[in-house]
Amino acid sequence: MLVTRAREAAESNTFYAQGGIVARPPGDSAELLASDIRRAGDGLCDPEAVDLLAREGPDLVNQLLVEELQVPFDREGDGFHWTLEGAHSVARVLHVKDETGAPIERALLDACRREKNVRWLTATTAVDLLTLSHDSVDPTDRYDPPTVVGARLLERETGDVKAVLARETILATGGLGQVYLHTTNPQGARGDGIAMARRAGARLLNLEYIQFHPTALVHPKGRLLLTEALRGEGAVITDAAGNRFLRDAHPDAELAPRDVVARAIHQRMLERDESYAFLDISHKPAEWIRERFPGLTRRCLEYGFDLTAGPIPVVPAAHYSCGGVSVDRDGATTLARLRAAGEVSASGVHGANRLASTSLLEGLLWGWRAGAAAARSVRSETLRRPIAVRPWEPEFEPVDPALIAQDWLVVRHTMWNYVGLLRSEKRLDRAGRILGELRDEIENFYRRGTMSDELLGLRNGIQTALAIHRAASDNRVSQGSHYRENGTEAASSPRRKRATLL
């Protein structure tokens, strides 16, 4: 059974991924890829997870995406067109123009639709995971090891809440960018999976490491991600006066790791009291830009900007969570029968900062391994007896949408200003007070209100925001995408290789 809160199954972060997916071109090696991942991760990567991804990930891309699903990656001559992205030693990124995620996801969904035994539940929001200790009507189940036995689901169209039992449950709920004021993520990236897993008792890992994409187009409609590949192909970043400043922050300038570029842009904006910086690729031939980046060219024109004509305004935006629900090599969490894959999980691959275009690769490999492990488990094990869960007891107080909207504004502004690119003890202390009070208010609101997707999202959002805040507050070491003003430098700290657990 595939469950998604979206009305269209394709609505996800994967669908909007632009740059590409890491594979293995001629002359590259697993060792070199692993080295690049570890360098970007700033010493916090799990070496075994990195080696697994570097060794098996590119082979799976070739086997599943290229040969079996025939994703139409761009070609050049007799081979593929490989692109270079920031912090990569070689050009090793496969892409489909500048809209790589969409054709990959379409191919995977089409393959799922061909399987007759897959049931689809769209417009269905998970309320909570079901556990033996909390949801079983048998009081002796509380003495069993923590075990997930399914989920409670809300049918958005009818408002009905029902329990669905499962021998294996896999979280693939994506990211949490919507808890920030500026984000490249779609509306559904509210941290739902993080919050549900935490309420069920799963261990969380490294949630302070939030990667901010350096370049999101500034527009009242929202923030449009401007792919890393633009800078890989020669785009430059300037301030309002037209000055390139990234060389002062890192020798690789525009091709430096994302956290370095994002902080440098943010700092420049603060120093100059400017609302945005500028990205410029207009020195390239216009036809080449339109051919290489057709999707971005089209989307930018819809927003009133022309990539081929001159610089366009950009800001850093919350983009990817390097942490999440702690998982092993097969996606198993610390709760029995619960697995996780993709951005909701923390496999240890990304460490303190993710290398560009490795997210699709990690999601592909860990999704493959988690699915295979779950299938083996289902074939070899059964629940020891039928499980009966407690019935849902609904409340019926109408939900005021103005309260939900205002609470989201408080969450997003607080996270952006105090738990964002630049963090300090004073900022984090203030954020803790604001978010803590708001959590209590939202929890009371949730317990009284009529169940809805919007109310669930708000509850999950505040709980995820507080989990990020706690991890950031506990970790005084500036490392990768977690930057503490006046914090300890990672290189001089004994915590350099220590993960932050919740």
Tell what function each PLM region has.
Residues 128-158, 163, 305-349:
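FAD-site-proximal beta/loop scaffold in flavoenzymes
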Residues 196, 202-312, 373-379:
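An anion/pyrophosphate-binding glycine-rich loop and adjacent beta-alpha core
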Residues 168-224, 357-369, 373:
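Glycine-rich loop(s) and the adjacent beta-strand/alpha-helix scaffold that form part
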Residues 6-38, 42, 221-227:
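Conserved N-terminal glycine-rich FAD pyrophosphate-binding loop of Rossmann-like flavoproteins
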Residues 45-56, 92-110, 121, 183-191, ...:
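Short beta-strand to alpha-helix junction loop
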Residues 7-10, 16-21, 63, 71-91, ...:
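Glycine- and aromatic-enriched mobile tails/lids
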Residues 65-160, 165, 172, 213-218, ...:
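Conserved redox-cofactor binding core of oxidoreductases
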Residues 1-4, 206:
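Short beta-strand "acidic-cap" motif of Rossmann-like dinucleotide-binding folds
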